């Protein structure tokens, strides 16, 4: 029962995150796992990304690396964590094959790598080479617990410094709190522009909720980097390792409740929503009683946009709460009802007691 439930849950997780299986009768399907040192060295020498700031457009992450990063991010709770990703490049695509955690000092808003983290990084990479894993470090990942996937000012500086000294390099951000609430992994992959570069107007990206106390940091730096399209893949060769890692993830998921575990996060979301409503209301009052007509019309559109975003945020909170409540009901029916039926004696009957007359 437990094994089948775990398998079903893992299949659901793979479907939720659109993880593709690369196995096929054609042997070329395994090329993604083959590391060609000659072509990678040639690519490093050619440096095509120097002539095109948008050269890298896609990221492929193995299911194993994704699950490792999610488990690591969830283990940190409300504290930020950090790790590195290993892989290779294939044209304009960065392929992440594996990931490992770093021993760093984290807070709720930032993460700091000390000397021991850099020593660990070097030793881990060298040991991997000795074990026949030739993939190089292709990026870093860290978590934003509860406030979305984007790069802060410190993240932009860190990523820009890494891109100057060890290209190609990628930044991945995971929100473990929203991952637990929504079920689907909340993740983003980014690369920064060089200083002084002005990017062209980009199409509107997928909307995400940004807390009011983070909006300024988000707005100031959002034009200094761009996001890459993220997809996932796996092979039947990963099945055993995925099973071992999934057991840890599955137990944590089954024994936790988004309604209880994310109580502080939900309270913070509602408080943030109230502040945004107050801000929108004050803007509406100002535009109603003052200003020239054209500017007031512009203000009205801006306020409508604000209200639209607030409506989206409130709908998202509602959906996540309903999702959490449904999961609790299902787990209650699945486990408690079975226990009650097992404890019920054979003489028990659901029929009503007969009437006794004297």
UniProtKB/Swiss-Prot annotation:
One of its GO terms (cellular component) is cytoplasm. It is found in: Cytoplasm; Nucleus. Residues 338-358 are annotated as: Disordered. It comes from the Eukaryota. Its cofactor is a divalent metal cation. CDD domains: MPN_RPN11_CSN5. The keyword Endoplasmic reticulum does not apply. Belongs to the peptidase M67A family. CSN5 subfamily. This is COP9 signalosome complex subunit 5b. It comes from Arabidopsis thaliana (Mouse-ear cress).
């Amino acid at each position: 029962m437990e094994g089948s439930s775990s398998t079903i849950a893992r299949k659901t997780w793979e479907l939720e995150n659109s993880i593709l299986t690369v196995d096929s009768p054609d042997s070329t399907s395994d090329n993604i796992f083959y590391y060609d040192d000659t072509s990678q060295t040639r690519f490093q020498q050619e440096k095509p990304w120097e002539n095109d700031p948008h050269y890298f457009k896609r990221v492929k992450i193995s299911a194993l690396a994704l699950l490792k990063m999610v488990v690591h991010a969830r283990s940190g709770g409300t504290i930020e964590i950090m790790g590195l990703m290993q892989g290779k490049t294939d044209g304009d695509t960065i392929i992440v094959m594996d990931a490992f955690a770093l021993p760093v000092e984290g807070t709720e808003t930032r993460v700091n790598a000390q000397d021991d983290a850099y020593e660990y990084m070097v030793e881990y990479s060298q040991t991997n080479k000795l074990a026949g894993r030739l993939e190089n470090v292709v990026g870093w990942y860290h978590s934003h617990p509860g406030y979305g996937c984007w790069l802060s000012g410190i993240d932009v500086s860190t990523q820009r410094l890494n891109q100057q000294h060890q290209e190609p390099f990628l930044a991945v951000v995971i929100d473990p709190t929203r991952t637990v609430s929504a079920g689907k992994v909340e993740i983003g992959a980014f690369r920064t522009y060089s200083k002084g570069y002005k990017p062209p107007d980009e199409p509107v990206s997928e909307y995400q909720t940004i807390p009011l106390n983070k909006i300024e940091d988000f707005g100031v730096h959002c034009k200094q980097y761009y996001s890459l399209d993220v997809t996932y893949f796996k092979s039947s060769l990963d099945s055993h390792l995925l099973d071992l890692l999934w057991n840890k993830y599955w137990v944590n998921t089954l024994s936790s409740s988004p309604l209880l575990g994310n109580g502080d996060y939900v309270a913070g979301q509602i408080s943030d929503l109230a502040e945004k409503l107050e801000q929108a209301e004050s803007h509406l009052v100002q535009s109603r009683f003052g200003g020239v007509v054209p500017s007031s019309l512009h203000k009205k559109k801006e306020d409508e946009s604000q209200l639209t975003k607030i409506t989206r945020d409130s709908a998202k909170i509602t959906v996540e709460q309903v999702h959490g409540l449904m999961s609790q009901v299902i787990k209650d029916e699945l486990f408690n009802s079975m226990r009650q039926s097992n404890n019920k004696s054979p003489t028990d009957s659901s029929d009503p007691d007969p009437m006794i007359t004297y």
